Curated annotation (Swiss-Prot):
Pathway: Cell wall biogenesis; peptidoglycan biosynthesis. This is UDP-N-acetylmuramate--L-alanine ligase. The gene is murC. InterPro entries: Mur-like_cat_sf, Mur_ligase_C, Mur_ligase_C_dom_sf, Mur_ligase_cen, Mur_ligase_N, MurCDEF_pg_biosynth, UDP-N-AcMur_Ala_ligase_MurC. Its EC number is 6.3.2.8. One of its GO terms (biological process) is cell division. It comes from Dichelobacter nodosus (strain VCS1703A). It is found in: Cytoplasm.
Length: 478
């Protein structure tokens, strides 16, 4: 179908009964992005979070009213209350909103309203969706299409995880963790992979999770496009069930769009792109490390070409892409008691994500010692993937573990960081160093652990990034 249809800009009149929007958990990455877009549309935005942060401060500077802590009176003037999946039904603000008969909606419902009046491009998948969303939004921006985007991470070039554009495209990271991606009605959907995560919301069944992705893809119109990574076994297995136009990508020979001649030079990837329906290929340099990011770039390339972006713009955009915060982000070079080291931070909290980054680091820094500092995220994930974590983390030259970031969960016997330490030790390849108090990690690294020219990578989706930033005090002047 012709995608040159011009969709009307979302304006206040589309939700004319709504003036005041309250976000419970406004500091979360997904929530804050939607709040920022709505602020820029002229709505009165307020919200609460359990702690002050750079995100809440940024929104306050933009004009949002921020409450630190939850209280019933916070929602009394709201026309609608938006909640994230992390907010319990017994939250005092949620209970008060229901008592006052104020509509309470999920984050994805508000995102769906933003998407309703635009050409929606939704990115889903267990891993890689933040980077893929960022690459896609960047290519559309480079092409002058001025998209609106809502991303689960900070797009470095924009300095934000959201932006209201004047164009008619909306690029959004979707969330499969709580099934809320079923609420979206995009025109193009990307699925990067399907891994066994968040199964508690899918009856504990991987097959049910895969069926959930099929349902998400069937929200596309019959003339929409599903962009699917055929290299992923889970995605490949659902292909026969997807009753929408499909374009696959990957390294596999049967992919519609393939990356060939892939090589890593330093922290950049070089590869050629070839499509099964074309005779010629074109060469790409991606300003990110790792084969997993080559796959993410292929998805963005397909979307760009589907929307008519010329190849030179795509090639230039990928070469100049500035990355996403907390995705193998280089904090800088530091001085310590035994020499110097490079410090990186990555959001990876699943074995597959961590392995991809470690592979890229070992390739990009061949011959240098890799020191990983890992904060497990959720007791359930640590329990369910204990052996996988142990296998992946055992390849490090040096490994530091700290206690599990609970993310609201109660402790589970056999699923804390000490249990993970024992499981890794059993592999016999690396002797993990357990440091319970995060405040002690930097002193131990600086004085006892690091050797000259080490590469340090902080992994985790919790608050380990705060520890990585503490290393900034040791940075040397460039």
């Amino acid at each position: 179908m012709n995608h040159e249809v011009h969709f009307g800009r979302i304006e206040r009149r589309h939700m004319r009964r709504v003036k005041n929007i309250f976000f419970v958990g406004i500091g979360g990455t997904g929530m804050s992005g939607i709040a920022e877009v709505l602020l820029n549309l002229g709505y009165s935005i307020s919200g609460s979070d359990i702690k002050d942060s750079a995100v809440t401060q940024y929104l306050a500077q933009k004009g949002a009213q921020i409450f630190i802590g939850h209280a019933a009176e916070n929602v009394e003037h709201a026309d609608v209350v938006v909640v994230s999946s992390a907010i319990a039904e017994n939250n005092v603000e949620v209970k008060q909103a229901r008592a006052l008969e104020i509509p309470v909606i999920r984050r994805a419902q508000m995102l769906a309203e933003l998407m309703r009046f635009r050409f929606g491009i939704a990115i889903a998948g267990t891993h890689g969706k933040t980077t893929t969303t960022s690459l896609t939004a960047s290519l559309l921006s480079d092409a002058g299409l001025d998209p609106t985007f809502v991303i689960g991470g900070i797009l470095t070039a924009a300095g934000s995880n959201a932006r209201l554009g004047e164009g008619h495209y909306l690029v959004a990271e979707s969330d499969e963790s709580d099934c809320s991606f079923w609420l979206l009605q995009p025109m193009i959907s990307i699925v990067t992979n399907i891994d066994a995560d968040h199964l508690e919301n899918y009856n504990g069944s991987y097959e049910t999770l895969k069926a959930g992705f099929v349902r998400f893809l069937h929200n596309l119109p019959f003339y929409g496009l599903a962009v699917l990574c055929i290299d992923d076994a889970g995605v490949r297995s659902i292909l026969p069930e997807v009753g929408r136009p499909v374009r696959t990508y990957g390294f596999s020979e049967d992919a519609d769009v393939r990356a060939i001649n892939v090589r890593q030079k330093g922290l950049a990837m070089h590869f050629d792109v070839i499509a099964h329906d074309e005779d010629r290929c074109f060469s790409v340099t991606l300003n990110m490390a790792g084969k997993h990011n080559v796959l993410n770039a292929l998805a963005a390339i397909i979307v760009g070409e589907e929307l008519g972006i010329d190849r030179e713009t795509i090639i230039e955009g990928l070469a100049q892409f500035k990355g996403v915060a907390r995705r193998f982000t280089h904090h800088g070079r530091i001085a310590h008691d035994h020499g110097f080291a490079d410090v990186f931070e990555d959001y990876g909290h699943h074995p597959r994500e961590i392995k991809a980054v470690l592979d890229a680091a070992m390739e990009g820094f061949a011959g240098r010692r890799i020191v990983a500092v890992f904060q497990p995220h959720r007791f359930t994930r640590t329990r369910d993937l204990l052996d996988d974590f142990a296998e992946v983390l055992a390849v490090c030259d040096c490994l530091v573990l700290t206690e599990v970031y609970a993310a609201g969960e109660e402790p589970i016997a056999g699923a804390d960081a000490r249990d993970l330490t024992r499981a890794i030790r059993a592999h016999g390849r690396v002797e993990p160093i357990f440091i319970a108090d995060k405040e002690e990690i930097v002193p131990h690294l600086r004085h006892d652990i690091l050797q000259d020219d080490d590469v340090v990578i902080f992994f985790g989706a919790g608050d380990i990034g705060r520890v990585a930033k503490m290393m900034d005090e040791l940075k040397i002047k460039e």
